[in-house]
């Protein structure tokens, strides 16, 4: 049997910026201010963003960051190490062949009313993540939540595992790409 990542939902990891910075509220506000300077596009073609803005994919926000974004890159690298250590004893190729080189690619998404991300994968990545700088209050219908499932446009199984996570400001959510 192929044993790359038998149950990807089991490899989710949730942390928060508050475990990396003293004043996470001020830090998040600073990151948001820096991101306001980044050029974005409304509903970029071929991307998962619906009713929202996304930075240009030609611009990797983590390539040569400065200021708060440089600190954010450092936080991400540290949290990837925490992630790996958490799962290092798992007997699957996803962990046993976990890349030792940290090649990060980052972008920003700003969702507006009724905005969301369509279901998608990051086929060129190994580990993906989201850092929540702003969230909407949940009104009982999973507003602002992130969902995980093995189902897709081309595959659907009602018995397939799924998980919905309601993030809070500062949450870092890692999951297999």
Specify the residue positions occupied by each region the protein language model found.
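Non-heme Fe(II)/2-oxoglutarate
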Residues: 2-95, 116
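Catalytic core of non-heme Fe(II) oxygenases with the double-stranded beta-helix
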Residues: 62, 66-77, 81-174
């Amino acid at each position: 049997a192929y044993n790359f990542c038998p149950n990807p939902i089991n490899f989710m990891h949730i942390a928060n910026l508050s475990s990396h910075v003293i004043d996470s509220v001020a830090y998040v506000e600073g990151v948001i201010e820096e991101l306001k300077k980044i050029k974005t596009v409304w509903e970029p073609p071929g991307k998962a963003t619906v009713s929202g803005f996304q930075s240009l994919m030609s611009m990797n926000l983590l390539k040569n960051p400065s200021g708060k974004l440089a600190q954010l890159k450092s936080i991400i690298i540290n949290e990837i190490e925490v992630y790996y250590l958490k799962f290092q004893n798992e007997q699957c190729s996803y962990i046993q062949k976990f890349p030792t080189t940290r090649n990060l690619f980052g972008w920003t998404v700003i969702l507006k009313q009724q905005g969301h991300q369509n279901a998608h994968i990051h086929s060129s990545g190994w580990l993906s993540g989201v850092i929540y700088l702003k969230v909407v209050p949940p009104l009982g219908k999973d507003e602002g939540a992130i969902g995980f499932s093995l189902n897709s446009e081309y595959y659907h199984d009602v018995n397939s595992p799924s998980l919905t996570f309601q993030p809070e400001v500062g949450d870092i959510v890692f999951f297999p790409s």
